[in-house]
């Protein structure tokens, strides 16, 4: 069975490695370059009701910005593409494995984690104009999932230790002054105003999402899922959150309010969808799914969907895995 490279922290796995026992529902999905048509409403494999597909596509209301992701062209490299399907660019092409890239608030650079040696992950920032990457950390631990704050001054990230435990940290944009702000968590993302951080943790037993203040105070639980994984995002206006939940090969993206109200399944059932990220205008969500290659470990592609659950589009179509997308300007 073909497999992708995985991280050493078990809680931070974004892709499943066990194959399904039953085939998924058959879906017809348009590519991003195709003329859009309404996407049919499907019955989810959940008690929750998915958003219904009723809106129509308007060219003026199409996706904008860029999406950066891990592409397994050769190993785990970084790629970027415009949200309208143009401008594909491979950012890295070296033996180092790269993961968890995200765009700076102004879209000028990406930060990411690189596996530079056995159990050594460092955080880098690459300028998108020059293509030059700069190492920001040095032997701080297993560092993954970096994200730059909305004001561009700080970076939050996950730090793992040799025992597999993970923590939420924050440092200056240049890598100075790293500080632990929470002792048990992973996959952090900033609130739109930069005063809070959303992250996953099992501090109360099961995996759930929590919010903590920038200074590490007032950690509080947000969700009540049964099989949450971790990767999440906060909408630009602060009104919504997204994450993914479910057992292996049956994961779905869910959208909800910061108080966990108005919960609904966003993705159609049967794709094993995960790793969501909002568009800069808050109208779309990108995610990884296996709709077209269900059951194949290397069958993951990048998709986008409107926040009302309509207009599902495939952004990539490759013989290798594309995953961990993050949307930026």
Which functions belong to the PLM regions below?
Residues 5-9:
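Sec-dependent signal peptide hydrophobic core
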Residues 2-4, 17-329:
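Sequence signature of WD/YWTD-type beta-propeller architectures
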């Amino acid at each position: 069975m073909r497999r992708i490279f995985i991280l050493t922290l078990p809680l931070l796995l974004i892709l499943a490695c066990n194959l399904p026992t039953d085939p998924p529902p058959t879906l017809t999905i348009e590519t991003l370059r195709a003329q859009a048509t309404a996407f049919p409403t499907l019955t989810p494999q959940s008690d929750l009701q998915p958003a219904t597909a009723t809106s129509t596509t308007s060219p003026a209301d199409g996706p904008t910005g860029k999406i950066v992701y891990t592409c397994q062209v050769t190993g785990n490299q970084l790629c970027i593409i415009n949200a309208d399907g143009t401008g594909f660019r491979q950012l890295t092409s070296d033996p180092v494995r790269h993961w968890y890239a995200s765009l700076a608030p102004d879209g000028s650079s990406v930060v990411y984690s690189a596996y530079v040696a056995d159990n050594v992950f460092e955080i880098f920032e690459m300028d998108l104009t020059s293509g030059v990457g700069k190492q920001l950390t040095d032997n701080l631990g297993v560092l993954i999932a970096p994200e730059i704050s909305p004001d561009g001054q700080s970076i939050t990230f996950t730090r793992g230790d040799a025992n597999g435990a993970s923590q939420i940290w924050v440092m200056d944009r240049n890598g100075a002054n790293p500080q632990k702000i929470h002792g048990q968590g992973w996959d952090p993302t900033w609130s739109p105003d930069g005063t809070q951080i959303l992250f996953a943790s099992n501090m109360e037993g099961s995996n759930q999402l929590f919010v903590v203040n920038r200074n590490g105070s007032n950690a509080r639980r947000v969700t009540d899922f049964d099989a949450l994984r971790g990767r999440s995002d906060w909408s630009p206006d602060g009104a919504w959150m997204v994450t993914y939940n479910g057992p292996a090969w049956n994961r779905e993206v869910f959208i909800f309010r910061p108080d966990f109200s108005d919960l609904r399944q966003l993705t159609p059932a049967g794709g094993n969808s995960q790793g969501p990220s909002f568009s800069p205008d808050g109208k779309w969500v990108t995610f990884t799914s296996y709709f077209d290659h269900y059951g194949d470990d290397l069958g993951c592609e990048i998709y986008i969907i409107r926040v009302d659950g309509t207009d599902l589009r495939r952004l990539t179509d490759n013989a290798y895995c594309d995953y961990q997308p993050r949307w930026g300007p």
